[in-house]
Amino acid sequence: MKDQLEIRKTLVLSTGHVTKRVAEILDEYRSQPEGFDLYWQNIEYGWLFRRTRLDNQDLEYMGRKIPRCLRNCLDLAAANGCDYLIFDCDGPQVDQLPFYNW
């Protein structure tokens, strides 16, 4: 049987695309708080988000809970067909999103 590689697309962004307050919250929880349908984990210099649990219905519902700066980043990842979103302190700044210099 031929091995098939499973390859997933990831968007990497600067941590500066979320506000300092959102960054503090992400660091505080370190992973998904109970009752919050978005999975992430802290990595050495940022956060890794998995958007595989999010479909359009969940995004509509969750849009009321997720801070706008984070929602914009998740939307950009989804629009580009990405399964994962990594925020890295050395990640690129993109013109499509606001940048918060904290």
PLM segments and residue spans:
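Short, surface-exposed beta-edge/turn micro-motifs
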Residues: 8, 44-46, 82-84
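A general structural signal for short secondary-structure junctions and capping/turn motifs
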Residues: 2-4, 38-40, 75-79
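Short, extreme N-terminal segment that most often corresponds to the first beta-strand
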Residues: 1-24, 86-87, 99-102
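Short, compact, well-ordered microdomains
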Residues: 63-102
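An N-terminal amphipathic alpha-helical segment
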Residues: 19-53
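Short, basic, glycine/proline-bearing loop/turn elements
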Residues: 52-61
